From Swiss-Prot:
This is Anhydro-N-acetylmuramic acid kinase. CDD domains: ASKHA_NBD_ANMK. Pathway: Amino-sugar metabolism; 1,6-anhydro-N-acetylmuramate degradation; Cell wall biogenesis; peptidoglycan recycling. The gene is anmK. HAMAP family: AnhMurNAc_kinase (MF_01270). One of its GO terms (molecular function) is kinase activity. Belongs to the anhydro-N-acetylmuramic acid kinase family.
Length: 436
């Protein structure tokens, strides 16, 4: 076969294969840095262009519509082990029972298997509750649980055994999204801004997305031209590098950890506990001295930088330097809330256009924290701060939908990273596929 015919045949084959992954059902799964549980969604994508409107109804003229959702708390032992693995030497805090591992490496293997078994149960429950046949689902996008994110060392580790999920659900699984970006010099994070651009960017204005998960990150989405607004088109030929996105600092990670330490709750619902306290300004200023806040973007962070041990160390230093200042645990929660609001709003204000109407759309679990939303609005007086619900997608499901979209990008052979966001040298197809 000559080169021309071979190339033509290959192109035709690829087009046929990738088109089969276009208008179909996908499952997205996400468990964030705060380790509060696993979210799973079932959605359908299409190639129709209208990214400013998203449907939760049966409307195939929309780029995406959400068909079903399900969320499940982690089993207590799995959560305990994952939290331990997130910290250097954290397994020393674990007391193994009969048959459990006795070394860190074995705990990694145990957690990867247990996480996948739990994820499989979550998927099967989602399918059962939505009365969905597995044959209609093209793939699962499963992020896994980040236990180490070391971009300065060139690696990021997400625990999940995709083989188990594929076997137990009968659906192909795309996972390990971050390391391909890191292989071309990127931070491996944040990845969600690429999805934000695909779904939320509009031709006539700039939009800013703020994701408040365990870590906060922003995506600044410039107006897109009509000829480039197709939901399917996301490649090296698009001007996607004009998107800016990066982590801004801690969010729910510290808020939840401090709440769990001092109350009988896992999180500060609505921010009511924080609102009952007073911000300790000298402590806030000390926390803002963390070197991450002055780093230039692209940048990413995680539990390695911001964790309960770091906070307790900072409190100890503060107590030694300011012994005359008295504060309560609620005051610390108020201060941590202000830390998130200030660090995020400071970065958002860089991109605010004083002559235009500006809107910031918030997603992630932090969008449900009314007090945090109030503090963000206070620090962003030139913006209207609202959640992505006003764009048609509830804030708690955005990240799970994003990984369904990333799985689709992988199967279609399309890039999933934004080099200007992650610092990668080029756009690449992300993830590894485990076929059912």
């Amino acid at each position: 076969m000559d080169d021309l015919n071979y190339a033509t045949l290959t192109e035709a084959l690829e087009q046929t294969v990738f088109e089969n992954f276009d208008d179909g059902l996908y499952i997205g799964m996400m468990s964030g840095t705060s380790l509060d549980g696993m979210d799973a969604i079932l959605c359908q994508f299409s190639n129709h262009t209208n990214s400013s409107n998203i449907s939760n109804e049966d409307n195939t003229q929309q780029p995406m519509h959400l068909l079903a959702t399900y969320s499940q708390d982690f089993p207590p032992r799995l959560r305990e082990v994952l939290l331990a693995l997130c910290q250097p030497n954290g397994i020393n805090q674990l007391t193994p029972t009969a048959g459990e591992p006795d070394s860190e490496l074995e705990w990694f293997g145990w957690a990867s298997k247990a996480y996948a078994e739990f994820a499989s149960d979550v998927v099967n429950t989602l399918l059962q509750q939505s009365n969905t046949d597995i044959e209609s689902v093209l793939a699962i996008g499963c992020h896994g649980q980040t236990v180490r994110h070391r971009p300065q060392m060139g690696f990021s580790l997400q625990l999940v055994d995709a083989n188990i999920i594929a076997e137990r659900t009968g659906i192909s699984v795309v996972s390990d999204f971050r390391r391909r970006d890191m292989a071309v010099g990127g931070q491996g994070a944040p990845l969600v801004p690429a999805f934000h651009q695909a779904l939320f960017a509009v031709p006539d204005s700039t939009r800013i997305l703020l994701n408040l998960g365990g870590i906060a990150n922003i995506a600044v989405l410039p107006a897109i031209s009509d000829d480039l607004s197709d939901f399917n088109e996301h490649s090296d030929n698009q001007p996607s590098d004009s998107v800016v996105g990066y982590d801004t600092g801690p969010a729910n990670l510290l808020l939840d950890a401090w709440t769990a330490l001092h109350t009988d709750k896992d999180y500060d619902a609505g921010g009511t506990w924080a609102q009952s306290g007073q911000v300790v300004e000298p402590l806030l200023n000390q926390l803002l001295e963390h070197p991450f806040f002055v780093k230039a973007y692209p940048k990413s962070t995680g539990r390695e930088d911001f964790n309960l041990a770091w906070l307790q160390d900072e409190l100890q230093k503060f107590d030694q330097a300011a012994a005359d200042i008295r504060y309560s645990s609620a005051d610390v929660q108020a201060t941590l809330t202000e830390l998130t609001a200030i660090s995020a709003s400071a970065q958002i204000n860089i991109f605010i256009n004083a002559s235009s109407n500006n809107a910031v759309y918030v997603c992630g679990g932090g969008a449900l924290n009314d007090y945090l939303m109030m503090r963000l609005q206070a620090h962003l007086p030139r913006c209207k701060v609202e959640t992505t619900a006003s764009l048609g997608l509830e804030p708690t499901w955005v990240e799970a939908v994003a990984f369904a979209w990333l799985a689709r990008q992988t199967l279609m052979g399309e890039t999933g990273n934004l080099p200007a966001v992650t610092g990668a040298s080029k756009g690449v197809v992300l993830g590894q596929v485990c076929f059912a």
